[in-house]
Amino acid sequence: MISNISITPIKTMFKNALNIHNFSFKSHTSTAIIGTNGAGKSTLINTILGIRSDYNFKVQNNNIPYHDNVIPQRKQLGVVSNLFNYPPGLNANDLFKFYQFFHKNCTPNLFEKNLLNKTYEHLSDGQKQRLKIDLALSHHPQLVIMDEPETSLEQNALIRLSNLISLRNTQQLTSIIATQI
């Protein structure tokens, strides 16, 4: 089970960014990381995910170094990141089927059913973002980490996203969200 994610700095890297001292994310709640552009939100998220190993932070999940236990727990993790894109030629339906191969209970919530056959590269930025959010949440992961999920979303999609996060809270699931809002 993914819980008790803690971050311990080995050395502070910047004067105004990522100045963190022994921080833990509380399980079964939503935590917002709020900051301006360049504050280090994405760097922190990528460090937690093990994507950035060049920053001097020690990230642990249940007192086990995060990079050592990502693979066994990947089915319990959902991620929304602008770093992730999908190969050309795949449509949303293909991507949901791919996710269903690993996660049997994969269900879309934000993505319009009439766009399922449209290829990823032909989706608008807002449609791509809704698809990324849906793929991250569709298997009901124990932990979802979202880096600026509000990017390119119109107001009604923002409201639906907020409702999905609230629903996760009632289900005692953990969400970590980096945002400027």
Task: Pin down the residues of each PLM region.
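The feature captures the beta-strand-to-loop junction immediately N-terminal to the Walker
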Residues: I34-T36
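A short, flexible loop at the N-terminus of ABC-type nucleotide-binding domains that lies
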Residues: M1-N22, S27, V70
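Conserved ABC transporter NBD signature motif
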Residues: D54-Q73
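Helix-to-loop junction immediately C-terminal to a conserved catalytic motif
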Residues: L49
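ABC-family P-loop ATPase nucleotide-binding domains
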Residues: N82-H122, G126, L131
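Catalytic Walker B motif of ABC-type/P-loop ATPase nucleotide-binding domains
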Residues: V144-E148
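Helix N-cap at the start of a conserved alpha-helix in ABC-type nucleotide-binding domains
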Residues: Q155-A157
